């Protein structure tokens, strides 16, 4: 065990070196070699592929309903690539509703539950009711840059970028929205609207944590000069913001380097975890795919918090299992898409998918969702943003079963040394 502990400490030191190398501008391939060595382990408990559904259009986000009986998927209607004008097609996105069957598979209930949405991305479920929004209301990130029109042209008009949080119930009824775009409270606080409102998570008190990846603002004339970071929206402010009023307890912003993407609150330590996606867009990310842990005090005092891992590529979705094991989706296109696993206090390992072969190839895994059921097993739903082909309506969502012993497997040595 002493040898194992030395190896773990050495790896932690190497992570710090990795960030330092990146900061000094050494070639990306040097960082990648170091990162691959640091994160070469696999999680001891493989996941089983239950289903690959081909029924979507660039699925970006997934969320379980409050009762766990349904899954909602955001179809982002992405077009193009980074090299040729990547963007979200105005008004082409929609939300799909699926039922969770007894065997863990999903079946389509309503393919187009809510339509006409621009850039529907991450979602979260409100745990504590307000006067306006019942507990169980789903909040959706939508309206973000980068935007393209139906002809594939980049949108230059600043007025057409209307980022917001859209609230709806399980039946697909829209209950309200919170404006995060031009003229909103968020622009007044930060000098810029939220440009790429990407993901959100709730804490047990109903406060919302929202990431702004701040990508795409330069397409407008004049451009938006946004900042990537994390917003905390107090539960007490939700109704006022939805009604267009100034809340007595306003949102708070913390700048985070590297274009933050996924965000979720740990069910065990209550901290807010944020990952970074900057490497996906060829942008500067000092962590080269990092994960930060922030307390509420960090946010209140405008502190970045602690970086707990780095060198993971370009991270998109982030979620926790029931016992606090963290999962991240690696979406960067020039290295394999995968799900990484962080046991508490440990560096990331890779989640192995069984059976192997073509079914295990993840094409742009994005905003994932996980939920535990009565038998102890957990379902992991993975939207695959880049699972494109020439025909509409058949992009992929993969459903995995994490066995009942998945979380307790963290007590075993992830490198297989004991």
Locate the predicted segments by residue.
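Blade-level signature of beta-propeller repeat domains, shared across WD40, Kelch, NHL, RCC1
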Residues: 369-418
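Beta-strand-rich domains and repeat architectures in extracellular enzymes and scaffolds
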Residues: 51-84, 89-91
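A short loop-to-beta-strand structural motif that recurs across blades of beta-propeller domains
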Residues: 84-87, 91-96, 163-166, 228-231, ...
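Bacterial N-terminal signal peptides that target proteins for export
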Residues: 2-17
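Short loop/turn segments immediately following beta-strands, especially the blade-tip
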Residues: 98-104, 172, 234-242, 294-300, ...
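Short glycine/acidic-enriched loop and turn motifs that connect beta-strands
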Residues: 77-82, 144-149, 215-218, 279-282, ...
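Beta-rich, blade/repeat-based domains predominating
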Residues: 55-68, 92, 114-146, 182-208, ...
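A short helix->beta-strand "capping" segment at the edge of beta-propeller domains
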Residues: 36-56
